[in-house]
Amino acid sequence: MGEVIVKYKVMLEADSMNRIDDVCNEIDSMDKEIGAVQFVEKKPLAFGLMFIEVTAIIQDGEEFENPLGKFEDLVKSFEGVTEIETLEMGRL
């Protein structure tokens, strides 16, 4: 079993920007079973829009079935989240 560190860019709907702090808190308090969120930060994108940068350590190995996909699906399930993009990935 190994661990993977992944940095994500999480986009919200334009009309959900007022919920960005709530989404940051939801991501930060995610269940640690799939992955441990290390950092959550709001960053400017353009024209008053923001995105959330998330760094997480995710368990990887044969005993885990698609852990990255499960983590991403969980983030996408939060209200207002439209897209999640992998920015960086590496093994620990």
Predicted features and spans:
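Long, contiguous binding/interaction regions
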Residues: 1-92
